[in-house]
Each structure stands twice: as structure tokens, then as C-alpha cells.
Amino acid sequence: MLEILRKPFRLAEYDLVLLLMVVALTSFGIVMVYSASSVMAAKNFHDGAYFLKRQLIFALVGCVGALVTMRIDYQLWRRWAVPLLFVSLILLVLVLIPGIGGKVKGASRWIRLPGFNLQPSEFTKIALIMYMAYSIDKKQDRIRLLSAGFLPYMVVLMILLGLLLKQPDMGAALTLAAVTIIMLFAAGTRLIFILGSGMVAMPFVVYLVVHSAYRLKRIKAFLNPEQDPTGIGWQIIQSKYAFGAGGFFGQGLGEGKQKLFYLPEAHTDFILSVIGEELGFIGVIVIIGMFFILVQRAMRIAMAAQDTFGRFLALGIAVLFAIEAVVNMAVVTGLFPTKGLALPFLSYGGSSLLISLFAVGILLNISAGLKLAPLTGKDAK
């Protein structure tokens, strides 16, 4: 580790546009977390800056981690891909054990640590991406086969999904499934295998929704939130009110009203609603633009990577950021049922922010020394 840190550090070697977007999103997220949470924090913790202080600590630790990670040769993660996947499996099991896993609103998604709640599903996302990149690189010539190229990934995915649904965490489960399928498709897996797996999975998804009261309520709230405006439809209705009140230019930073105990999870999953109310359509468009640039740069890094492992590692991270951002934005605007997915870099939460910044560090290391080609061009090698 010390040898890595002693190496000459040349910032110009890395993708500075990607770095700028991440710094901007993280910094803006800290400001909005304070704006969205100060009143609630003052009431519940007698400290309006309670969540601000914690998010600042998470951001500082995450930035230090990203700075270290961006200087570690990404090839190192090839050796750690399988061990880290096993670690994620162990963590997903531990979170289900009473006394170790902490329950919040009926879901066991966190492992209680001193001063911090670890969310294993966030760690699992990056661990699975590393494993997928490592395995795809290892079996490139067999990726189009069913028994050797497709089914092993489905077995791993099913184990992870089973543990996630046991928590339950449908949002993380669907995210992992989408990332896996997209990476396999990009690797050359036959489309018939993917479509077939989707047809097999569909009855199980329907069963999980129909036989779960809270999931069924979420679907009903998505289809017609006004049917129960003071119950299950309350959150999405208040979110829409926030966007409507913001108009084009917003009410002004800190001047939003929905965060005053009207909009649940205002500083976490629904932070974009607060941004929409306080900074308006312009503010939301700026956020969407920054995410677009971030994902675009990550895709360019994937295209320009010098080896298959680096290419799919960058691709997986790019897809993860894209899915999380798009799904979160769709949920808060009422286009998707609520899923419990954080908005990367912006929502309050230590696990999400730390893992996101760690993933950015990996992307930056892959980008070091690359000539990044435009998305419409050929791979730069």
C-alpha cells in the first residue's frame, strides 16, 4: 500500500471530467441533505446539522478511499473478485440473523456497527460486478454456451436474489438482476437465453407481488395514488406536490415546504423531490445532465479499456450508476412503483456513498493514461 502511495501522482492522467462530475454531485448532495433534513434532525436529534455532519464524514472517508483506489492497479481486483463475492454472501446471511441485522420498518437490511449501519446490498453490487468482469474475461470463448456460459451466472444471481428478497430488498434485487443481464448481453450471451430466463422469472415476480401485502399496496399506489391519498399514496402525492410547487426556477434553496414532515424520506430516496421544489425544473435538469455526463464518461472508459476485465468492470459500474439514477428519478416522479433505491452521491446514506466513491476510484484507475474515444467512435486502444 505504501509503495502505491509513493508513486508519482499526476492528476492529468485520469478522466478529469468524470472526477469533476463526481465532486460536483457529492458536494451538491451534502448541501441538499442539510436542506432536506435540518428541520427533522432538529426535532428528532436536537441538532439541525445531525445528518449533515454524518454525510460529511461519509463523504470525506469515501473521497480518501477513492483517492487511494484510483492509484491501485485495477488488475488487483481480478484476484479479489471471488473472495469479495463470498464476503458479500456472508454479509447477506449475517444481516438476517437477529441481534446482528437491524430492522427498520420491517426490513432487515443493515448490520449494526458502532456509529454506522452497514448495508450489505450496496457492497454486493460492486462485488458482483467484479466477479462478472473476472468471469467473463476468463471464459470469453464459452460465454455463448448455456451450461458453461449462462447458467453459472444465473445460479450465482439466484442465490444473491434469494438472500436479498429475504430481507426484503426488491430494489437491490432488481438492480443486481438488471446489471447481470446487461453485462451478459454485452459479453455476447445469446439473446434466447436472456429472453428464456425472463419468461421463467416472470411467474415468480408476479407471485412475489401478489402474495406480499406491502408490494401489492405499492403497485396500487403507483397505479392510482389518489385512491388512498392519506395512506399508501401519500408519499408519491407529496413528491408530485414538491415538483409542482418548484415550477421552473424553484422556491429557493432551503425554502421548500414538503420536507417539513409532509414528504417521507425527503433526505434519502426522495431527495430529488426536494431539489425539484427548491431549485425547480432547472435544478433537476442540471442533476440529470451531470448524471448523463458521468455515465457517458464511464462508458467511454469501458470502450477504451485495454483488456476485457477492465472493459467489463467499467461497464458494470456505468450500468449500475445509470440504473440507480434512472430508477430513483422514475420513482420520485411516479413513473415507477417505489423501490427504496438511493440516488447515487445525493441521497443521505453511508453505505451507498462509500461504495459509489469506491467504484469511482476504480473507474479513474482504469481511465489512467487512456485516450477516451467518443461513444460513437471506435475503441481507443
Curated annotation (Swiss-Prot):
Membrane topology per record: Multi-pass membrane protein
Keyword Metal-binding: no
Compartments, record wording: Cell inner membrane
Highest taxon of the lineage: Bacteria
Pfam families: FTSW_RODA_SPOVE
Enzyme Commission number: 2.4.99.28
Family recorded in the similarity comment: Belongs to the SEDS family. FtsW subfamily.
Pathway involvement of the protein, from the record: Cell wall biogenesis; peptidoglycan biosynthesis
InterPro entries per the UniProt record, alphabetical: Cell_cycle_FtsW-rel_CS, FtsW, FtsW/RodA
Species per Swiss-Prot/TrEMBL record: Trichlorobacter lovleyi (strain ATCC BAA-1151 / DSM 17278 / SZ)
An example Gene Ontology molecular-function term: lipid-linked peptidoglycan transporter activity
Biological-process GO terms, alphabetical: cell division; cell wall organization; peptidoglycan biosynthetic process; regulation of cell shape
Keyword Cell cycle: yes
Keywords: Cell cycle, Cell division, Cell inner membrane, Cell membrane, Cell shape, Cell wall biogenesis/degradation, Glycosyltransferase, Membrane, Peptidoglycan synthesis, Transferase, Transmembrane, Transmembrane helix
Catalyzed reaction equations: [GlcNAc-(1->4)-Mur2Ac(oyl-L-Ala-gamma-D-Glu-L-Lys-D-Ala-D-Ala)](n)-di-trans,octa-cis-undecaprenyl diphosphate + beta-D-GlcNAc-(1->4)-Mur2Ac(oyl-L-Ala-gamma-D-Glu-L-Lys-D-Ala-D-Ala)-di-trans,octa-cis-undecaprenyl diphosphate = [GlcNAc-(1->4)-Mur2Ac(oyl-L-Ala-gamma-D-Glu-L-Lys-D-Ala-D-Ala)](n+1)-di-trans,octa-cis-undecaprenyl diphosphate + di-trans,octa-cis-undecaprenyl diphosphate + H(+)
GO CC annotations on file: cell division site; plasma membrane
Major subcellular location class: membrane
Membrane-spanning segments: 16-36, 56-76, 80-100, 145-165, 168-188, 191-211, 274-294, 312-332, 343-363
Protein name (record): Probable peptidoglycan glycosyltransferase FtsW
Function, as annotated: Peptidoglycan polymerase that is essential for cell division.
